[in-house]
């Protein structure tokens, strides 16, 4: 099927759906038709704009035959030579298969990897940077778990981020983030290299993952603070083990055992859902060869070099000399570049 035929079908389908809704249909069919129309109507509008621009181009080319109209027609054609490719590119992007999770909230997990105390300190800074990014985007950032080290570093930080297109924006952040700098405890001025792992998981809905209570082992214990001191005399902390997969989630952020269990289940569902998504993605060779990487947590994706003031994303060879701005939450320039690279790779794979 040619692109033109695909566009014709979309316009025709939108017209059919509008007629169906106007005629009146029963509840379930009405909901399904409304949802489908909402999905394709923005593409239909782009198609109509493209066709209007194509008609304007044809009219301008015909007008060039008139010497009195040639200058005006040439100006119109110059404008349309920019407009037409842009509209066609936007339509091709809109026709790419969508990740069903893109519009979902996300679970952000950050942990220190190699580098001891320095890795934990950078993990805390990176967690704070993503929190500021959420603020800049107008998202809600709720801490589900935040465990500090004695020096104020981060042993484990988990947050739920809700808002528009959260997972779509953050999904390329999963992987190993490397930091190069002179630690505050370094007396010789030597640069140390440490690493932090970031995982971004789409939040799972009940229909995505079925969790059987019989598959869970739930332990309760007393919450502890940094250094292991007890901060709660009641057994409010919860550890849930999913026996079939061995996934373990511990939660002690809340004073209520019930709230800790609810948060732990939310994280467990997200991890199980991501496991399912990863297995499906492994079978899609084109996706796994995407230039922006696989989203694997073991993949080194970015380096933050403080002495040089630079941030380098290794997947797309992008270097920004504005590390201070990035650590203040200004990730958009990096994320935009990653998104464009991913779109280009998917367009190439689709032969578009």
UniProtKB/Swiss-Prot annotation:
One of its GO terms (cellular component) is cytoplasm. Keywords: Cytoplasm, Methylation, Protein biosynthesis. The keyword Protein biosynthesis applies. It is found in: Cytoplasm. Pfam families: PCRF, RF-1. It comes from the Bacteria. Methylated by PrmC. Methylation increases the termination efficiency of RF1. Signal peptide: none annotated. InterPro entries: PCRF, Pep_chain_release_fac_I, Pep_chain_release_fac_I_sf, Prokaryotic/Mito_RF, RF-1. GO terms for molecular function: translation release factor activity, codon specific. The modification N5-methylglutamine is found at residue 229. PANTHER family: LD18447P. Belongs to the prokaryotic/mitochondrial release factor family. Peptide chain release factor 1 directs the termination of translation in response to the peptide chain termination codons UAG and UAA. This is Peptide chain release factor 1. The lineage of its organism: Bacteria, Pseudomonadati, Pseudomonadota, Alphaproteobacteria, Acetobacterales.
């Amino acid at each position: 099927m040619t692109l033109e035929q695909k566009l014709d079908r979309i316009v025709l389908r939108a017209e059919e759906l509008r007629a169906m809704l106007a005629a009146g249909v029963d509840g379930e069919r009405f909901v399904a038709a409304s949802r489908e129309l909402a999905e394709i109507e923005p593409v239909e509008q782009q198609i109509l704009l493209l066709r209007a621009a194509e008609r304007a181009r044809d009219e301008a080319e015909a007008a060039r035959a008139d010497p009195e109209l040639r200058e005006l027609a040439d100006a119109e054609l110059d404008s349309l030579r920019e407009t037409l490719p842009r509209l066609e590119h936007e339509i091709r992007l809109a026709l790419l298969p969508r990740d069903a999770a893109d519009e979902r909230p996300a679970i952000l997990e950050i942990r220190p990897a190699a580098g001891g105390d320095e890795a934990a300190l950078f993990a805390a800074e990176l967690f704070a940077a993503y929190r500021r990014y959420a603020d800049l985007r107008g998202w809600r950032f709720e801490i589900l778990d935040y465990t500090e080290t004695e020096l104020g570093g981060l042993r484990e930080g988990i947050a739920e981020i809700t808002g528009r297109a959260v997972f779509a924006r953050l999904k390329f952040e999963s992987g190993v983030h490397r930091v190069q700098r002179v630690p505050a405890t370094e007396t010789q001025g030597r640069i140390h290299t440490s690493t932090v792992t970031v995982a971004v998981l789409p939040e799972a809905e009940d229909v995505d993952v079925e969790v059987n209570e019989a598959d869970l082992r739930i332990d309760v214990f007393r919450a502890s603070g940094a250094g292991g001191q007890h901060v709660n005399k009641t057994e409010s902390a919860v550890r849930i083990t999913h026996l079939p997969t061995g996934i373990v989630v511990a939660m002690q952020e809340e004073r209520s055992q019930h709230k800790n269990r609810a948060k732990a289940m939310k994280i467990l569902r997200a991890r199980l859902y991501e496991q399912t998504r990863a297995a499906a993605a492994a079978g899609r060779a084109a996706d796994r060869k995407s230039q922006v990487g696989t989203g694997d947590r073991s993949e080194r994706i970015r380096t933050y070099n403080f002495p040089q003031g630079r941030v380098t994303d290794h997947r797309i060879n992008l270097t920004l000399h504005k590390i201070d701005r990035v650590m203040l939450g200004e990730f958009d320039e990096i994320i935009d570049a990653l998104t464009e690279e991913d779109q280009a790779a998917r367009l190439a794979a689709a032969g578009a």
